[in-house]
């Protein structure tokens, strides 16, 4: 840390750090708090910012006030991103919980997103196992296990074969 940087108030340094973190991608409030509290890697190793709890609260409040930090926007974008990568609703819920998002906010966003989880599960299965999907029991079990690992619900997985049989 240079001498001019060390003389800057902790609040200004935290605000600068928050802006840099949020410029890369959206974060949940809990993620941002964790990253702000982590030591900064400097030329001489990890360096702490000697900020008070009030400084952290002011930075978080400023980010909320100016629209840089919005948990509902983060949740919506996170759900869209993870579903595009082929993950199901159970896995997405778990990851959002780990990121400090409340269950209510997660459920609200899951209801508002317009994603056909059954179609997404079928796409993942055909991408991995090819078309047509196997009907042999042992192969079906492999596909079910794969989709459960990806976070799909059993009802969506079973619908793949119900719709396939029609």
From Swiss-Prot:
This is Regulatory protein RecX. InterPro entries: RecX_HTH_2nd (IPR053924), RecX_HTH_3rd (IPR053925), Regulatory_RecX (IPR003783), WH-like_DNA-bd_sf (IPR036388). It holds the Pfam family RecX_HTH2. One of its GO terms (cellular component) is cytoplasm. The gene is recX. One of its GO terms (biological process) is regulation of DNA repair. It comes from Escherichia coli O7:K1 (strain IAI39 / ExPEC). Belongs to the RecX family. Its main location: cytoplasm. The keyword Glycoprotein does not apply. The keyword Cytoplasm applies.
């Amino acid at each position: 840390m240079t001498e001019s940087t060390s003389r800057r108030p902790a609040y200004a340094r935290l605000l600068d750090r928050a802006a840099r973190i949020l410029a890369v991608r959206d974060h949940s409030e809990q993620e941002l708090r964790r990253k702000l509290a982590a030591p900064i890697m400097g030329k001489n190793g990890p360096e702490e910012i000697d900020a008070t709890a009030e400084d952290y609260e002011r930075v978080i409040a400023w980010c909320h006030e100016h629209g840089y930090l919005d948990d509902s926007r983060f949740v919506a974008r996170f759900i869209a991103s993870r579903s595009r990568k082929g993950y199901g609703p159970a896995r997405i819920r778990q990851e959002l919980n780990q990121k400090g998002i409340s269950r209510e906010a997660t459920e609200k966003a899951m209801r508002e997103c317009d994603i056909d989880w059954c179609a997404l599960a079928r796409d993942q299965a055909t991408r991995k196992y090819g078309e047509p999907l196997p009907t042999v029991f042992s192969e079906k079990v492999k596909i079910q296990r794969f989709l459960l690992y990806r976070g799909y619900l059993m009802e969506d997985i079973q619908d793949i074969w119900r719709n396939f049989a029609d």
